[in-house]
Amino acid sequence: MAKKQWQKIDGIVLLNKPEGVTSNGLLQQVRRVYNAKKAGHTGALDPFATGLLPICLGEATKISGLLLDSDKRYIATLQLGLETDSGDKDGNPLKTIAVPALSKAMLETVFSQFEGDVMQVPPMYSALKHQGKPLYEYARKGIHIERAARPIHIYELKLIDFENTVVRFEVLCSKGTYVRTLGEDIAKALGTVGHLTGLHRTQTGALTGDEMATLEEIELNKDAYLQPLDLPLKHLQAIHLNAKDTDKILHGGKLAVEEPETLLVRFYDPQQRFIGVGEWQQEKQLLKPKRLFNLNPIGDDHS
């Protein structure tokens, strides 16, 4: 059998993840659509969750770590009164507790308690490792592992609406935040229990859901949905290099320039091609390459 020939594909696909499928399963499907040798996502969504799942192809995988560290925005639906073992609707019911009469003032008061710097205990149903194994493997066997609370930051926590025992809210949070756990903690603060019945991601760093597409749409017109590598980095200052400085950066050299507005910057060569990410060294007052990309020259086929 002939060895599979991969395409030289570099870019980002903003996938609109549907409910009921895994992030890794979708990643492999998108990879096959583009016949890309390398592919990675920028933070998995649980199977029940939907929304923005950026897929990095080819050289874009070099910046997936930057996106993993990005803040995320979600819209969540919290069902009060019923606790599940996973904190979402896919889990097994554990217990029910009566829900107090809700009011907008009560909910907003509770929400305000979770804004800012917060310590959060990660859930058992998570991919965090314990002795080399993900926690969810222990959870599925009924084994409880003690987990230390970790610092997270909640930038915004806004009530959207509520009806009977269902509350919808929007949250902008730091990396490492488990919105399932946030929902459980909100329920506890309200004097009851709860689990998420819906979770929709609308933002990852500078990327928003405005241009995301379903897998079916991507399969029909894949070229239209392949975004440039620098799309998620628009918040970084752009540094346009001359030929001499381009050569220096591409060979690992450092530049003595004025301090940039952002600690990380985008490098462009004289042809205005994005060639990598730079990092400002405060102590040395120098700009050094952090991530460089081996991209196709202008005019190369990306089909």
Curated annotation (Swiss-Prot):
Q: Which gene encodes it?
A: truB
Q: Mind telling me which NCBIfam families this protein's record contains? A: TruB (TIGR00431)
**Which organism's genome codes for this protein?**
Hydrogenovibrio crunogenus (strain DSM 25203 / XCL-2)
This one is known as: tRNA pseudouridine synthase B
Name the PANTHER family for this protein: PSEUDOURIDYLATE SYNTHASE TRUB1, TRNA-PSEUDOURIDINE SYNTHASE
Q: Which residues form the active site?
A: D46
Annotated EC? 5.4.99.25
Q: Which UniProt keywords apply?
A: Isomerase, tRNA processing
Coiled coil region boundaries: none
Stated role: Responsible for synthesis of pseudouridine from uracil-55 in the psi GC loop of transfer RNAs.
GO terms for biological process, alphabetical: mRNA pseudouridine synthesis; tRNA pseudouridine synthesis
Q: Which InterPro entries match?
A: PsdUridine_synth_cat_dom_sf, PsdUridine_synth_N, PUA_sf, tRNA_psdUridine_synth_TruB, tRNA_sdUridine_synth_fam1_C, TruB_C
According to the UniProt entry, its GO molecular function terms are:
RNA binding; tRNA pseudouridine(55) synthase activity
Alphabetized HAMAP family for the sequence: TruB_bact
According to its UniProt record, this protein's enzyme class is isomerase
Q: Which family does it belong to?
A: Belongs to the pseudouridine synthase TruB family. Type 1 subfamily.
Catalytic activity line of the entry: uridine(55) in tRNA = pseudouridine(55) in tRNA
